[in-house]
Amino acid sequence: RDPRYRGYNRALDASRPVGSLLKPAIYLTALADSARYTLITPIDDGPFVWKSRGAPDWQPANYDKKFHGLVPLRTALAQSYNAAAARLGTEIGIERVLDTVRRLGVDRPMRPFASTLLGAIELSPLEVAQMYQTIASGGFRSPLRAIREVTTQEGRPLTRYPLAVEQVFAPEPIYLLAAAMQDVVREGTAQSLSKFLPPEIAVAGKTGTTDEQRDAWFAGFTGDRLAIVWVGYDDNRAARLSGSSAALPIWGDMMAALAPEPLALAKPEGIELVLIDPQTGLRGGTSCPGATEVPFMQGSAPQERAPCSGTMDAAVETVEQTVQKAKSWLERLFGR
């Protein structure tokens, strides 16, 4: 042992491929373009090949070795489908996605390769925490710090490091992304988190697993806590573990001990909730089996009604919309 050696701080210094932890940046970039993408927009999870001059073809496979055809955008994220994410990322533009990653707080060179979309980029756990902090705080980026001030022996401050906050994303697409990341926990790759936390503790998160299962990640946040877990070997050996089997249980145990506040997303003014018929993806009603309330940016929800939605549902919805408009008008008038 060398007493002068302070050890290796993996949280700060271990840069590792992040895998699917980068996918929220793809979906955030898409959701910001509400004219083209919503949480229910069909995304193709069929076989995908990316051709690049002077390089072998790149064809990502899904974790389950299957392709799933057209799936809603929120399902593609919840189930962490690689082909869907790669196709969507190249469709909207790799550079645009990387710009989103930078705005989330990653300050390091990134090459605009298609494989980068699926996390072929090395970040430290602290850098990942910076990304997810921006999402968790509603699009406000605040540089993470461990020191608030330096004081004298008597407690007089010598240097202060004040909190710096910058809004880098509109609240609406961030809200949609966070809602979709709750689906990751409710019904997606992180649903085993229910073994560690009671159902009333709402969580948003994302699993991550890299090639040959060398790195396992879980990033998640509640109403008052955000944590990142990485599991792997320093020598880059294959751990043969996934984000959901290795990193998630550690995250869950830790959060259970901390008794966190549930995540309660504050709905921005530019978001509306609409009942959607899951069979058709059209505007549904209470008479549609399994109709689900889905958030949309104002004006982006489907206008066509599903066959299962009768005239009574349409009338009720019209009344509700009128009441909501009147409420918004009164709030603006009286400043409440």
Q: Where does each model-flagged region fall?
A:
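A penicillin-recognizing enzyme superfamily signal
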Residues: R1-A14, L22, T75, Q79, ...
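Mid-domain, small-residue-enriched loop/turn segments at the edges of structured enzyme/sensor domains
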Residues: A55-N62, I92-Q130, G139, P143-A146
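Short active-site loop at a secondary-structure junction
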Residues: Y5-A25, L39-P42, F67-V71, S115
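Conserved catalytic neighborhood of penicillin-recognizing serine enzymes
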Residues: R36-V97, F113, R141, T152-D183
